[in-house]
């Protein structure tokens, strides 16, 4: 069989047989990280794709460059001739496009339901967990690619090596993040699943019950077939608690001795980490991951667990980790700029939960031990700020200098006592760091930076809101990055 014939047959495997009646798919909120990737994969399958978003962005521009019609603003006429609407949790039920679809009896499906259809007829691998999903999904995708398995992937961030967050591969594999924030990962029925950790986040979805959140993860793992595989972090106390209830094949990973896959002899080397992985029935394997932090060693172990089970060679695993160039906004180095007799390094990170922020701080200390750590932090959602208030106080007090932006609401209404001013006051009372409130709209960010930053500082922009755009602006227009 010629390579061309094989590729064409592989493409046929990607088709969704039961969606043959669907020609035109419209995405409401197409600029979202989870939405745009699915839209691009479906467009590459030959479906007509359109979408709308409230604001233009780099993402919507890229979608248009790829031939997808994007409307800025939500209007009923945008859905003309659509056969189905795909919506994210963030979309208001009163959205005019949603209301028009209801009136016209056009099916409305959630993002994860459409992802589930993509996964239904393939060898699906879903990566779940409160933290680390994007990096773990990216690592596993890279390992499969190094073995020339050419997976389809849908990732919540830009894979730096490809410049995109989704692509249609020619093999039976599809790797995707499984989102627990709205419990929509229950739509997925993968062949293999990873759970990186379980932590208290998005608790409004689970009526404030952590037990209900854990129950939902058990239900997710039971979406696996009886011959599937769950690869879970055995170091996580909440995962260990639910394991007796999981009636599927399980492999555990972590640093503890009782795990099936373990990392030992970890050495930290600037922006890299070296470790030896132990797997049952295999020789020890010394590896280097081109990312700092113990949390990234755990992410690598998760990917190794699935990759090994899928037949990826040790050589491909090693190449993937050593050459891994990271994911957009995951400890992403933006560059350096001169200040006095030294320089300041600018790093941007998406982490927005206290445990994610703490992991980033540890990675920053590990990779740049001689630099003072200045953090520009933007809390994400009033509800998370309220629910994790004490944890934020403890974690944010670990930096040398803290600059606080106002809470990014993500569609939420303000909650009394869950704003940045109250958070700053509580951090100040703890007495370890003196936070500075910043309103970039007033144009005082640059002035404050000039007064706060010192030669050889590490400036870390942190959060899931528009602080990432501020980081890019600092890099491109103000800080003269080399």
Swiss-Prot record:
Cellular component terms (Gene Ontology): cytoplasm
Name its species.
Acinetobacter baumannii (strain SDF)
* Localization in the cell: Cytoplasm
Quote the record's binding site residues for ATP: 129-135
List the coiled-coil residues: none
HAMAP family hit by this protein: MurC (MF_00046)
> Reaction(s) catalyzed by this protein?
UDP-N-acetyl-alpha-D-muramate + L-alanine + ATP = UDP-N-acetyl-alpha-D-muramoyl-L-alanine + ADP + phosphate + H(+)
Function description: Cell wall formation.
- GO biological processes: cell division; cell wall organization; peptidoglycan biosynthetic process; regulation of cell shape
Classification via Gene3D superfamilies: Mur ligase, C-terminal domain, Mur-like, catalytic domain, NAD(P)-binding Rossmann-like Domain
Q: What is this protein called?
A: UDP-N-acetylmuramate--L-alanine ligase
Keywords of the record, alphabetical order, are: ATP-binding, Cell cycle, Cell division, Cell shape, Cell wall biogenesis/degradation, Cytoplasm, Ligase, Nucleotide-binding, Peptidoglycan synthesis
Pathway involvement?
Cell wall biogenesis; peptidoglycan biosynthesis
């Amino acid at each position: 069989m010629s390579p061309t014939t094989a590729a064409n047959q592989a493409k046929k495997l990607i088709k969704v047989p039961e969606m043959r009646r669907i020609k035109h798919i419209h995405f409401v909120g197409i600029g979202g990280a989870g939405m745009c990737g699915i839209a691009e994969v479906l467009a590459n399958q030959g479906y007509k794709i359109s979408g709308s978003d409230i604001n233009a962005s780099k993402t919507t521009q890229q979608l248009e460059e790829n031939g997808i019609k994007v409307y800025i603003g939500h209007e009923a006429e945008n859905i003309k001739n659509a056969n189905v609407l795909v919506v994210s949790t963030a979309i208001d039920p009163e959205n005019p496009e949603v209301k028009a679809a209801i009136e016209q009896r056009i099916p409305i499906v959630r993002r994860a339901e459409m992802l589930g259809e993509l996964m239904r007829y393939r060898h699906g691998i879903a990566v779940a967990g409160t933290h680390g999903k994007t990096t773990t999904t990216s690592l596993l995708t890279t390992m499969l690619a190094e073995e020339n398995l050419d997976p389809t992937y849908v990732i919540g961030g830009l894979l730096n090596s490809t410049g995109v967050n989704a692509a249609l591969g020619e093999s039976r594999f599809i790797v995707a993040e499984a989102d627990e924030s709205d419990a929509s990962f229950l739509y997925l029925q993968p062949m293999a699943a990873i759970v990186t950790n379980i932590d208290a986040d998005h608790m409004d979805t689970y009526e404030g019950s952590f037990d209900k959140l854990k129950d939902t993860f058990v239900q997710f793992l039971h979406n696996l077939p009886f011959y599937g595989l769950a690869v879970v972090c055995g170091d996580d106390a909440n995962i260990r608690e639910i394991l007796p209830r999981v009636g599927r094949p399980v492999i555990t990973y972590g640093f503890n001795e009782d795990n099936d896959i373990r990392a030992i002899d970890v050495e930290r080397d600037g922006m890299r980490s070296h470790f030896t992985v132990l797997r049952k029935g295999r020789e020890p394997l010394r590896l280097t991951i081109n990312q700092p932090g113990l949390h990234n060693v755990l992410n690598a172990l998760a990917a190794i667990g699935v990759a090994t089970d899928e037949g990826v060679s040790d050589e491909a695993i090693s190449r993937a980790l050593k050459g891994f160039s990271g994911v957009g906004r995951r400890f992403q180095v933006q560059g350096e700029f001169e200040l006095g007799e030294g320089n300041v390094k600018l790093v941007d990170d998406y982490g927005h939960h206290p445990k994610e922020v703490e992991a980033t701080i540890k990675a920053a200390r590990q990779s740049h031990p001689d630099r003072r750590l200045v953090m520009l932090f933007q809390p994400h959602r009033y509800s998370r700020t309220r629910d994790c208030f004490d944890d934020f106080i403890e974690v944010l007090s670990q930096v040398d200098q803290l600059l606080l932006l106002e809470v990014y609401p993500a569609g939420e209404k303000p909650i009394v006592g869950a704003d940045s001013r109250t958070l700053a006051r509580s951090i100040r009372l703890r007495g370890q760091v003196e936070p500075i409130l910043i309103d970039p709209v007033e144009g005082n960010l640059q002035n404050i930076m000039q007064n706060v930053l010192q030669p050889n500082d590490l400036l870390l922009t942190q959060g899931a809101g528009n602080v990432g755009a501020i980081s890019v602006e600092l890099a491109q227009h103000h800080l003269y990055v080399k």
